[in-house]
Amino acid sequence: MSDCVIHTHWAGPMGNMQYVIQSGSEALIVDPAWDIPELQAIVTQHGLTVVGILLTHEHYDHVSGVPECLALNKVPVYISEYAHYDPPVPMVLNRLAVGATIPFAGHTIAVLHTPGHSPGGVCYQLGKQLITGDTVFVDGCGRADFPHSDVAQLYTALFETLWPLPDDTVIYPGHDYGPTPTDTWGNQKKTNRFLQSETREVFLRKRKG
């Protein structure tokens, strides 16, 4: 998917990074929670048609703007089938099973099941581009002390699901918490202290600490 352009919009009190993924004249919006008019302005500026909304997980700071987005764009909303809501969200969702794919502008987006920070955590792989949500940040990873978090699942997500990805894959996290907004996966293996855990037990201690 080398022809995909990822536009970033920084918003909210927690350094959220929301994305508009462009391929040709089509667009996907990722994790709309803040400043929906500004996200829509990116769409309009580039003459795009929104064809879907991708949610990396179910936390409020990643989904709260979906109803406003849907008022502007009547499109499918994609999220993991394992996402947990309390209370339930008032919208129709396309639940993604493990191994699911999403067609986009003649391409295929791979949905990588990465729970741990939340039950519904997923990453979206677009060739050498990876939308990671709160699974992994630049030089960090998602917290695992929320209700329904599971630090052991987070270890599996990082070291079994994501670890084999090509080193030149560029990660696009859900928050701007690092020295740079994005980075290559290979560089993160060298600089991210959570990814430098020698064993599962070491990682669990680091993330719980």
Give the ranges of each region predicted by the language model.
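Conserved beta-strand hairpin/beta-sheet module of binuclear metal-dependent hydrolase folds
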Residues: M1-H46, C123-G133
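Short Gly/Pro-enriched turn/cap motifs at secondary-structure boundaries
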Residues: H9-W10, L93-N94, H113-P115
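Active-site HxH/HxHxD metal-binding segment of metal-dependent hydrolases
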Residues: G15, A27, W34-A110, K190-F194, ...
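Core dinuclear metal-dependent hydrolase active-site scaffold
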Residues: Y19-Q22, G99-L126
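Hydrophobic residues in well-ordered beta-strands that form the structural core
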Residues: V30, V77-I79, T132-G133, P173
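Histidine-centered catalytic micro-motifs
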Residues: I53-V63, L112-G121, Y172-G178
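Metallo-beta-lactamase
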Residues: P119-K208
